[in-house]
């Protein structure tokens, strides 16, 4: 009697990449459209955030919310702290718990894992148990931006992209036979760190102020917040202190985040050489700044495009 052929298990490894990570939403939408449903899902940093939304069955509602984010909304999630990182991240995770996912990973409808980094030992940490919201918060704790997360066992965790930007190894450990890897940093060296002097007549559309910027500034002034918001804008990529024009040189935060992403690109190349995935999706989003979380629609569209272009790689293993 012939043995039944086992259906290969598909794993999705969603990579780190800050705001470009909204492309993961488009990747998932395109896969589902083509009838490819991941059996396991894992992520590093922003990949853990989007992966958790999918594992919780909340992808489309999450996509609707992300697509409506404006600059005002992004600024509203910034809860500043003087030590350990610029932001505490409590506002974001509290919102996530209320609106999307607040359950233990073990009870997830779909097997889910997140990657974090032990700040003391440098070890890679796979988060497969406990609160899914806490796992996401640890995985997105980019050093310098978000404060580290202290776990119950005493470990201090930071962003998973520091050690494993595209967690192919975790997807395989979770039982995946076929791994689809989403690499958001493949074109990082083509990013446009703004030149010191713009060519004559050249305008950088990506840095235009939000239409509601004057109203937002008025609200800040009325609330006595103008001073610290001026400093925030000086830190943020793509704006000067008034938020009105591109800078003559990269901001401190832009330099820090771009340096981290270059490091992650090198790590990804090395790890993929040793453990190549069956399919690589590489959205081309070099034009997006790392904190452009208000530009989700174009990232989602590029995620869809890149996935559909890469699908022939997958068909060889699925047929």
Predicted regions and their residues:
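Patatin-like phospholipase
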Residues: 1-44, 52-319
């Amino acid at each position: 009697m012939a043995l039944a052929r086992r259906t290969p298990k598909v794993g999705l490894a969603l990579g780190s990449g800050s705001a470009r990570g909204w492309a993961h939403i488009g990747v998932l939408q395109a896969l589902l459209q083509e009838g490819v449903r991941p059996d396991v899902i894992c992520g590093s940093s922003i990949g853990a955030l989007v992966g958790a939304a999918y594992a919780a069955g909340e992808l489309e509602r999450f996509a609707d919310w992300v697509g409506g984010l404006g600059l005002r909304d992004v600024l509203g999630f910034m809860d500043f702290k003087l030590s350990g990182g610029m932001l505490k991240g409590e506002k974001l995770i509290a919102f996530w718990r209320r609106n999307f996912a607040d359950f233990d990973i073990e009870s997830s409808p779909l097997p889910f894992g997140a990657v974090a980094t032990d700040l003391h030992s440098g070890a890679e940490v796979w988060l497969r148990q406990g609160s899914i919201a806490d796992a996401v918060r640890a995985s997105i704790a980019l050093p310098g931006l978000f404060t580290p997360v202290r776990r119950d066992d005493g470990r201090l965790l930071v962003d998973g992209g520091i050690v494993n930007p595209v967690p192919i190894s975790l997807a395989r450990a979770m039982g995946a036979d076929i791994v689809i890897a989403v690499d958001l940093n493949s074109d990082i060296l083509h990013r446009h760190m703004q030149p010191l002097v713009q060519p004559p007549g050249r305008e950088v559309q990506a840095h235009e102020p939000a239409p509601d910027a004057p109203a937002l500034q008025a609200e800040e002034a009325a609330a006595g917040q103008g001073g610290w918001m001026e400093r925030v804008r000086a830190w943020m990529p793509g704006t000067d202190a008034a938020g009105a024009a591109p800078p003559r040189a990269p901001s401190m935060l832009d330099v820090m985040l771009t340096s981290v992403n270059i490091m992650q690109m090198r790590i990804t190349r090395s790890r993929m050489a040793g453990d190549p995935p069956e399919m690589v999706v590489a959205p081309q989003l070099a034009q997006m700044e790392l904190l452009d979380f208000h530009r989700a629609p174009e990232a989602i569209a590029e995620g869809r495009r890149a996935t559909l272009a890469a699908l022939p790689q997958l068909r060889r293993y699925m047929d």
